[in-house]
């Protein structure tokens, strides 16, 4: 963990302590070794599906998949990729709600390894610290870039911002379409899943929670 930022370590420890960290193992192989291993196994999987890897359209697919898994869609499993965040002292004494709405969410269902596509809204009441608005998008993306279930993802985002901002006053709302429902099984193309998580004043005060949810509808 020596190559991890202090923020990454604090967030990871908070998630582990609360029991909401993604089930992960400690990896002993470096990225290149893991890419090679995944590529080899994907060759066997693709053959078992019945595809011809000698075709020029498919021959590089195992390598593409290995790079995609390690460097892109599952890069959030590595806390070395946690966004660099600088807390800014709240010298302006901002006391009103800060809301970032409609943050793009693209994740992967850990049950079937197909897409979760949706939007995330994050709000907080600044206490000692504020952070750059783009950092909210980056933290959401970090936790999305790993196999996920939406309920846990929502809780992870909440606790991450509570830890970074050193305040309980955080709210998270997620609305997403699950392609494991859309493209297989029931094949429901219309339904979506909504999850939310509230802390501090958002949890304790009904009017504050109502204000947050009302703003999402505008």
Curated annotation (Swiss-Prot):
Identify the EC number(s).
3.5.4.16
Pathway(s) of this molecule: Cofactor biosynthesis; 7,8-dihydroneopterin triphosphate biosynthesis; 7,8-dihydroneopterin triphosphate from GTP: step 1/1
The reaction(s) catalysed by this protein are: GTP + H2O = 7,8-dihydroneopterin 3'-triphosphate + formate + H(+)
Name the top EC class. hydrolase
Domain of life the protein comes from: Bacteria
Coiled-coil residues: none
**A biological process (GO) annotation for this entry?**
tetrahydrobiopterin biosynthetic process
Gene Ontology cellular-component terms for this entry are: cytoplasm
Q: Which Gene3D superfamilies match?
A: 1.10.286.10, 3.30.1130.10
Q: Which PANTHER family match?
A: GTP CYCLOHYDROLASE 1, GTP CYCLOHYDROLASE I
The family classification in the record reads: Belongs to the GTP cyclohydrolase I family.
- What protein am I looking at? GTP cyclohydrolase 1
């Amino acid at each position: 963990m020596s190559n991890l930022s202090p923020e990454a370590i604090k967030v990871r420890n908070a998630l582990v302590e609360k029991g909401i960290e993604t089930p992960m193992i400690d990896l002993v192989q470096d990225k290149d070794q893991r890419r090679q291993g995944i590529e080899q196994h994907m060759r066997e999987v693709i053959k078992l599906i019945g595809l011809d890897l000698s075709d020029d359209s498919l021959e590089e697919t195992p390598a593409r998949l290995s790079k995609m898994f390690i460097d892109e869609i599952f890069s959030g499993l590595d806390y070395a990729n946690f966004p660099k965040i600088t807390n800014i002292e709240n010298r302006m004494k901002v006391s009103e709600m800060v809301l970032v709405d409609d943050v793009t969410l693209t994740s992967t269902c850990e049950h079937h390894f197909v897409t979760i596509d949706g939007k995330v809204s994050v709000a907080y009441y600044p206490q000692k610290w504020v952070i750059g608005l783009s950092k909210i998008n980056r933290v959401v993306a970090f936790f999305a870039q790993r196999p996920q279930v939406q309920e846990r993802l929502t809780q992870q985002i909440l606790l991450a911002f509570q830890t970074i901002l050193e305040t309980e006053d955080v709210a998270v709302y997620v609305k997403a379409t699950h392609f494991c429902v859309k493209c297989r099984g029931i094949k429901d193309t219309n339904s979506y899943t909504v999850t939310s998580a509230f802390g501090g004043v958002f949890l304790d005060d009904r009017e504050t929670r109502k204000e947050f949810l009302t703003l999402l509808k505008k």
